[in-house]
Each structure stands twice: as C-alpha cells, then as structure tokens.
C-alpha cells in the first residue's frame, strides 16, 4: 500500500517503513504524528483519489530526528561592476518514519 501525502507545501509518495525528510515540524523526536492531508491511496489496482484529500485517511508517522541540510551557496555577480554577493543557507528538516497507512 502506498499514499501520496502533502506536508510543508510539498508532495511525497510514501510506503510503510519508509524514512524521509520533510519540512521542519513542531514535534519532539520520538513522538507520533498523524498526517491527514492524503491526496491519493493505492493498493495494487485499487486507487482512491481525493478531491482534494481522501476523507477518513491518515498516515501515522514517528519523528526520528531534526536536522539541517547541506549548505546551499547563492552567489551573484554583476559583470564589469566590481560587485558580487555570496550568501549561504541551510534548511531545517524533520526526518520521519512512516508506521501505518489507514484508508
């Protein structure tokens, strides 16, 4: 069984036992989180598509850890102007593990 969920403004295809990084969530490490914005649930040939979300469906997850991604360097240069800007950014994320998908 798989599901397509929406969290942090992005969509992810998840299955039971999968670990993935999502936008930072306000939850302690080791706590359970229920995600209810389920766009699609599929099992073999049987597929339920939400409009926009599947009613009564949820994905139970456990928060594994919080962390920060690799640094992204933003470099802007203006030719012939002797002007340049260098800026770095590290995005916060939450690593979750999918425990169960309930349709």
From Swiss-Prot:
It comes from the Bacteria. GO terms for biological process: translation. This protein binds to 23S rRNA in the presence of protein L20. Belongs to the bacterial ribosomal protein bL21 family. Part of the 50S ribosomal subunit. Contacts protein L20. PANTHER family: 50S RIBOSOMAL PROTEIN L21, LARGE RIBOSOMAL SUBUNIT PROTEIN BL21M. This is Large ribosomal subunit protein bL21. The gene is rplU.
